[in-house]
Amino acid sequence: MIVLAAGGSTRLGAPKQLLTRGGETLVHRAVRHAAATHPQRLVVVLGGYRSEVACALADLNGDHLYNPRWREGLASSLHVAAQGLTGHDGPVLVLGCDQPALEATHLQRLLDGANSAASGCAATVHGTALGSPAVITRAMLQDSGGLHGDQGFGGRLSSLSSDSVWRLDAAELQLDIDDAADQIAAIAGGWLDG
């Protein structure tokens, strides 16, 4: 399982990983929910705000992997995670820490859905696209070298036949925190502390 927490939050101007919901940082919340699914291995990719984010996770289990190229975008963190999961041969759940409505039940539903999907993959529906959180195959993770910049696996998941990918419809996961407007909306909706 991969929790991506390396971003620099440049559009927000403050580390979104450390925003809180109910007094708990979003990164702690994401890792706690990920751990609740009892993964074989849990890695957290750190980059921007590395020490602050690691400190927020001090009481949780998981391997912290540092992405020295975090400024290059999401793909560089996926490359680090792929290297860190060498030897793991099962499905891989990939999630960020910027969806304040995320619950462990979302993650478990994705894992269960991927288990029954022909492709072995499951993804969250974001409008007409597929995205995070998502379950991908180990082979897809190993092929992350073809990703660049802020590319994730959404395009590859969308290119699979639609009936082979299990889809999670969870409107509450549409809200992810990228900028001040998202933060304001999340506070107004009760998803973040004010």
Where does each model-flagged region fall?
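Conserved alpha/beta core of the MobA/IspD/sugar-nucleotide pyrophosphorylase nucleotidyltransferase superfamily
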Residues: 1, 142-194
